[in-house]
Amino acid sequence: MNLLDTLQRGLADLDAQGLRRVRRTADSACDAHMTVNGREIVGFASNDYLGLAAHPKLVAAFAEGAQRYGSGSGGSHLLGGHSRAHAKLEDELAGFAGGFSDAPRALYFSTGYMANLAAVTALAGKDATIFSDALNHASLIDGTRLSRATVQVYPHADTATLGALLEACTSQTKLIVTDTVFSMDGDIAPLAELLALAERHGAWLVVDDAHGFGVLGPQGRGALAAAALRSPHLVYVGTLGKAAGVAGAFVVAHETVIEWLIQRARSYIFTTAAPPAVAHAVSASLKVIAGDEGDARRAHLAALIERTRALLRRTRWQPVDSHTAVQPLVIGSNEATLAAMRALDAHGLWVPAIRPPTVPAGTSRLRISLSAAHSFDDLARLETALLRASEEAA
């Protein structure tokens, strides 16, 4: 059997299991109301939590950045591609998200995946031990694999088991890595307990705040600020393509850690820098996030979250206890989840079906992503369609 035959059989297996993914094509800007595949829909699929992806100030800043710096960076950060826009943004990010450190410095990456790979692989070598939450994002998992370190996976948010594993560990370098807001459940890691364990056992805590940055904490400064945590043993990864509404990611840590990443993080060194216009737009986004408008958007999002939590409890399915913009509704089988997704789609609602391997088998779910761009009328429309789909599935 040749490779094409093998791949075709694999695709057929995915079809049979209800696991093949299908892309939809957006014909308009990311917003609550969009044109997708030629249809007008209300989208509950994006991670645009503050509704900034089409914000006029960010769009104008993007255009201004392109006029000033051009359309591309022209090279990697270490070989000619590092612009004044990148440098300015890194200084701003260190000040905005680095309150946990006495000497914070930031490093900008093109994607969150690359930032997580860098943070894990550059800090943990083959003689280290990494302790990873069982529900961590794939990018953290891939980072642990590429690091060649010993990896201990602890049950989700189980600090007792983690403590026992740390107690038994003899490695000189120990890293605890965790999402802050877990992307498919919406719950928040016990960060204060994790940091206490890290400091007790001489470990470092690496947190991926992809779904918390811009939303959690005072002025949206993130999960560490929300928990009022400070320590020199923290490494913070934030994403700029979700609540910030643009693209890219960053790592904030003690200045020595960041200098090490510049010298040794392969996902930073061996890739072309993001266009400076992107960094220029992120700088504009930070001003919105930290200002009165950002506060108003977070307050509206919080009200939407509470309304949605009440709605999900009225269905026949199993909501996850989430107080974040990620509101999952566990249905179970792939087939039933796809049927519910199609029922919502028939009402002009885009709510994605999340299936294995993204979530464990038997826990396929609808993942409702809320945005400050949504209105209560949008939620009322979701309520009508979701309750009808729930009744029809009974």
Swiss-Prot record:
It comes from the Bacteria. GO terms for biological process: biotin biosynthetic process. It catalyses: 6-carboxyhexanoyl-[ACP] + L-alanine + H(+) = (8S)-8-amino-7-oxononanoate + holo-[ACP] + CO2. InterPro entries: Aminotransferase_I/II_large, AON_synthase_class-II, AONS_Archaea/Proteobacteria, AONS_Proteobacteria, PyrdxlP-dep_Trfase, PyrdxlP-dep_Trfase_major, PyrdxlP-dep_Trfase_small. It holds the Pfam family Aminotran_1_2. Pyridoxal 5'-phosphate binds at G112, Y113, S183, H211, T239. The modification N6-(pyridoxal phosphate)lysine is found at K242. Keywords: Biotin biosynthesis, Pyridoxal phosphate, Transferase. Pathway: Cofactor biosynthesis; biotin biosynthesis. Substrate binds at R21, H137, T358. Gene3D superfamilies: Aspartate Aminotransferase, domain 1, Type I PLP-dependent aspartate aminotransferase-like (Major domain). Its EC number is 2.3.1.47. Its cofactor is pyridoxal 5'-phosphate. GO terms for molecular function: 8-amino-7-oxononanoate synthase activity; pyridoxal phosphate binding. Homodimer. Catalyzes the decarboxylative condensation of pimeloyl-[acyl-carrier protein] and L-alanine to produce 8-amino-7-oxononanoate (AON), [acyl-carrier protein], and carbon dioxide. PANTHER family: 8-AMINO-7-OXONONANOATE SYNTHASE (PTHR13693:SF100), CLASS II AMINOTRANSFERASE/8-AMINO-7-OXONONANOATE SYNTHASE (PTHR13693). HAMAP family: BioF_aminotrans_2. Belongs to the class-II pyridoxal-phosphate-dependent aminotransferase family. BioF subfamily. This is 8-amino-7-oxononanoate synthase. The gene is bioF.
